[in-house]
Every structure is written in C-alpha cells, then in structure tokens.
C-alpha cells in the first residue's frame, strides 16, 4: 500500500511513487526496540498473545508505545520481506481494521494477528500467500477496495485527493483493468482534484461491467458524471486515432 503520511510533528520530503508525499527516512538503529521476540520461535509453536505483543513492541518507541508508526512500519515490512507499497500490506491492514495508513495501533495489531495466528515474522511470511489469495474472491476484493478509500484518505477530508486516488487505483486495479492506463491518463488531464466515495465505488463497478470497446455503456445510466466524461473523452481519443490512421 502507498506509504502513510507522517503525523503533523513529522517531516515530509521528496516525492514517492505516483506523486505522493514520502517522508524523510530515519535510520532503524535510532528506533529503540526490545530484545527480539523472534529467537527460538518455531512455526509449529502455538499462538502466544504475550509473544505477539513483544513482537509489536519491537517496532514502537518509548514515546508512543501503543502505536506502530512509519519508521516501525518500514522495519516490519523489511522483516517480512515485502515493500510497504505491496498490496498485501493493504490486505493486512484490512484484516487488522486499521484506520490510518502507515500506522497500526496495539489493539489493531492484536486483533488482526490473533485472527491470523501470527506472533512472529516467520509466521507472517508463511501467511502472505493466504493474504494475497483473499483478493481473488470478488466479494472480498470489493470489501477491501471500499475499505481502502477511508483508510487512505486524510481523516480530516471528506474526499480523497487525486494523487492518493491515482496511487490507490494503480495498486488495486492497475494490473487487472484493461482500461486503467486510459483512465489514469484521463485523470491527468481532467479538472478533478479529488474523488468522492460514490465515484470511487463506481469506478470499481465500471471496471467490472463495462467492456473495453465501451459498447455496453449507457450514457443515461446511473453513473457519476466523472465516468460519463471519461467515456466521452476515450471515444474522442479513439476516433482521432482512427481518423489519423485512415488518412495516412
């Protein structure tokens, strides 16, 4: 999942993939941790809440012992061998019921990892394929897609800013929706600075039901104006290509 924004006291610098903010990196060695809870843990060992919480504390700081923040998140991702932007991290956040991108609370951590029977990095690595497989179920994917909207947008904003929306759409639909490249191009040149939840949910429905040639799109249907404009724009682009090809 795209990296979370730091809280107000943290610094933000550079640009992350898809044009989103990326915070300045902090050395992992500067993060106080407890002695590793991963020593001598075998995969066949039963789940231990105590061990799970000790693992959580490896990624927190004395200032915020009940919150795993961006620095801890990077270390956690490193330990389980995935990039923070990997979609499996979004699925994990969904399982935890996490409310803010880039952060896990102690309660969220315990809820999700108890359900997954994970109390160590080694056990989490084994669960990654299962978490990815959840995306193969259409209903589960829809739930995760809807969850991603509130999870990724700024909590004090009603809508998701367009940069975050494009990054999340790339993550969720980029590999599976044939028209995604054209839709991303449409957003680039459009007037839209944000996407509301109704638009967000309808983009998924559009990607699942409308054919590549747009022949089954009903302009009088109950689609958001944004998608009407996308269809009009794409048809114009295609007609221009056809005209250019025909005259050459």
From Swiss-Prot:
Name of the protein: DCN1-like protein 4
Domain DCUN1, first and last residues per copy: 47-235
CC annotations in GO: nucleus; ubiquitin ligase complex
Subcellular location: Nucleus
One Pfam short name: Cullin_binding
Biological-process GO terms, alphabetical: negative regulation of protein neddylation; protein neddylation
GO molecular function, one term: ubiquitin-like protein binding
UniProt superkingdom: Eukaryota
Disordered: region residues: 1-35
Biological source species: Drosophila melanogaster (Fruit fly)
Keyword hit for Heme: no
UniProt keyword terms in alphabetical order: Nucleus, Ubl conjugation pathway
Skewed-composition ranges (Polar residues): 26-35
Function, in words: Inhibits neddylation of cullin components of SCF-type E3 ubiquitin ligase complexes and thus regulates SCF-type complex activity. Essential for development. Function inhibits cell proliferation and cell growth.
């Amino acid at each position: 999942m795209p990296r979370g924004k730091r809280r107000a006291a943290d610094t933000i610098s550079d640009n992350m993939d898809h044009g989103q903010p990326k915070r300045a990196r902090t050395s992992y060695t500067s993060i106080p941790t407890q002695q590793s809870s991963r020593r001598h843990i075998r995969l066949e060992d039963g789940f231990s809440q105590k061990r799970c919480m000790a693992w959580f504390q490896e990624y927190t700081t004395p200032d915020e012992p009940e919150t795993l923040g961006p620095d801890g998140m990077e270390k956690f991702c490193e330990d389980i061998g995935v990039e923070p932007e990997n979609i499996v991290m979004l699925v994990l956040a969904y399982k935890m019921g996490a409310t803010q991108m880039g952060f896990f609370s102690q309660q969220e951590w315990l809820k999700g990892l108890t359900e997954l029977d994970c109390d160590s990095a080694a056990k989490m690595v084994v669960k990654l394929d299962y978490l990815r497989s959840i995306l193969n179920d259409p209903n589960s994917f829809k739930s995760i897609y809807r969850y991603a909207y509130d999870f990724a947008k700024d909590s004090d904003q009603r809508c998701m800013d367009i940069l975050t929306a494009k990054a999340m759409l790339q993550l969720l639909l980029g590999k599976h929706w044939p028209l995604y490249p054209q839709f991303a191009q449409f957003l680039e040149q459009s007037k839209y600075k944000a996407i509301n939840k109704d638009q967000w949910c309808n983009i998924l429905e559009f990607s699942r039901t409308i054919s590549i040639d747009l022949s089954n799109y009903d302009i009088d249907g109950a689609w958001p104006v944004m998608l009407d404009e996308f269809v009009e724009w794409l048809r114009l682009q295609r007609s221009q290509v056809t005209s250019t090809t025909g005259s050459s």
